[in-house]
From Swiss-Prot:
Residues 171-181 have a biased composition (Basic and acidic residues). GO terms for biological process: defense response; DNA-templated transcription. Residues 87-181 are annotated as: Disordered. InterPro entries: bZIP, bZIP_sf, TGA_domain. Keywords: DNA-binding, Nucleus, Plant defense, Transcription, Transcription regulation. It comes from Oryza sativa subsp. japonica (Rice). Residues 121-139 have a biased composition (Polar residues). Belongs to the bZIP family. This is Transcription factor TGAL11. Residues 87-99, 148-159 have a biased composition (Low complexity). Residues 181-225 form the bZIP domain.
Length: 489
């Protein structure tokens, strides 16, 4: 049994050692051993061959295990081949060489020479095993080459996927833009229109600021020119004013600014054809604004009555029409009445009666003020002399009497302001809402034109002033003959 098994093992593993040998050569070498060495020499040769084949089988198994380990690591993506050439080189390295490891120095064992029939079967089995081993090695090389090609194709596939994703996202964005809700599209259009209007308003506002800056610079130049010529708007040059007068000037400046805004509201309400209720509120506000002016004037009269009477708070053109420190009611009615047409008969009668009563009150106040002036002049004239010590006492007495008479001047100014205020209230009662709006608007425009006239007068060039002075001299010379004609009178 031992010899039979020993004879089978070498022939079973023979296919692993003889890579590339053919069956006739094997049979010829077997016959050669049988003929040359007899039975003992063939047994010795096959004993050595058995040892070599066993060693070769162990070596081939280890190489097969290493090849399987390398293939597993390739599939686990630890050390992939970069190219197909590298995979082919690894496959060629893993293939065992077509030689036998035969060492004659090993101990030789005797065995019986197998029969020719057994030898033929063993050689056939070895040839089959050799073919299967070659096929397995070829399959492993092809798998490694396919694996390397797959690793080379991975970056290209990733790039293609990125391109597809980008194209799909762009397509989806276009589709979302096309399928937006009409409300959203309309809202976006409204937002764009609002932004455009906002930019236009900003541009117009900047232009308005620039034009206002230019006008302010022009006004400063005009004011400086007026000061150099000795003409000051709303005040006497170099005059000392009291604290009450300075406070009134500041309050009056703010009152003028508020009056400009109220005039704009009246103008807008008339052109917009507002209802009577809304327009009445604007008219009542304008009337209350004039009541505020009369309150300021009463406080200024108590602080410094001469400041109101002299009209230093007004412009030069307005001073020409002052009456007791303000406008004359009858003259104002004559100026405003033509702009209130059409008027009913009842309104005409009411305005005429108001004008007559105003004239009567004005005459009474004017007569009283004239008497006060005459009395004050007599008191100051008969006051004695300051140089004479004997008459110094009488002088101080007359001065105290003159101061008492001057205090009556405050009463005249307050009564004149009351007459002005009552005239405005009576006009408000007689006229309709729209007529009253036109009345207050006409009064405001009248005083604005007077102030504008003063500004133009103050801003005249000096050459025109010199020419006017020359013309006045010529007129005075030309008027001398006419004066001589009426010298007797």
């Amino acid at each position: 049994m031992g010899e039979a098994r020993r004879g089978q093992n070498p022939h079973h593993v023979l296919g692993y050692g003889f890579h590339g040998t053919t069956l006739p050569n094997s049979m010829a070498s077997a016959n050669l051993f049988e003929q040359g060495g007899g039975g003992g020499g063939g047994a010795a040769y096959f004993g050595e061959l058995e040892e070599a084949l066993v060693h070769q089988v162990a070596t081939l198994r280890r190489r097969a295990q290493q090849t399987a380990t390398t293939t597993t690591s390739h599939h686990g993506h630890t050390t992939p081949f970069s190219t197909a050439a590298a995979a082919a080189t690894a496959t060629a390295t893993a293939r065992p060489p077509a030689t036998l490891d035969i060492f004659p120095s090993w101990p030789m064992r005797r065995s019986s020479l197998p029969t020719p029939k057994d030898g033929c079967s063993n050689v056939t089995a070895d040839t089959t095993d050799s073919e299967s081993s070659s096929k397995n090695n070829g399959d492993q090389g092809a798998a490694a080459a396919d694996m390397a090609s797959q690793f080379d194709q991975i970056p290209q596939q990733q790039q293609k996927q990125h391109k597809k994703m980008a194209a799909s996202s762009t397509h989806s964005d276009h589709r979302m833009t096309k399928t937006l809700d009409p409300k959203i599209m309309r809202r976006l259009a409204q937002n764009r229109e609002a932004a455009r209007k906002s930019r236009l308003r900003k541009k117009a506002y900047i232009q308005q600021l620039e034009s206002s800056k230019l006008r302010l610079a022009q006004m400063e130049q005009d004011l400086e020119r007026a000061r150099s010529q000795g003409l000051l708007l709303g005040g006497s040059p170099g005059g000392n004013t009291s604290a009450g007068a300075a406070m009134f000037d500041a309050e009056y400046g703010r009152w003028l600014e508020d009056g400009g805004r109220r005039m704009a509201e009246l103008h807008g309400g008339l052109h917009a054809h507002l209802p009577d209720g809304d327009l009445r509120a604007i008219v009542d506000d304008a009337l209350a604004h004039y009541d505020e002016l009369f309150r300021l004037r009463a406080a200024a009269a108590k602080a410094d009555v001469f400041h109101l009477i002299t009209g230093t708070w007004a412009t030069p053109a307005e001073r020409c029409f002052l009456w007791m420190g303000g406008f004359q009611p009858s003259d104002l009615l004559k100026t405003v009445a033509p702009q209130l047409d059409p008027l009913t008969e009842q309104q005409v009668v009411g305005i005429c009666s108001l004008q007559q009563s105003s004239q009567q009150a004005e005459e009474a106040l004017s007569q009283g003020l004239e008497q006060l002036h005459q009395s004050l002049a007599e008191t100051v004239a008969n006051g004695g002399s300051v140089v004479n010590e004997a008459s110094l006492g009488s002088f101080m007495g007359y001065m105290a009497l003159a101061l008492g008479k001057l205090s009556n001047l405050e009463g005249f100014v307050i009564q004149a302001d009351n007459l002005r205020q009552q005239t405005l209230h009576q006009m408000h009662r007689i006229l309709t809402i729209r007529q009253a709006a036109r009345c207050f608007l006409a009064i405001g425009e009248y005083h604005n034109r007077l102030r504008a006239l003063s500004s133009l007068w103050a801003s005249r060039p000096r050459e025109i002033l010199v020419a006017d002075e020359g013309n006045c001299g010529e007129l005075s010379i030309a008027a001398q003959p006419s004066e001589s004609q009426f010298s007797a009178f």
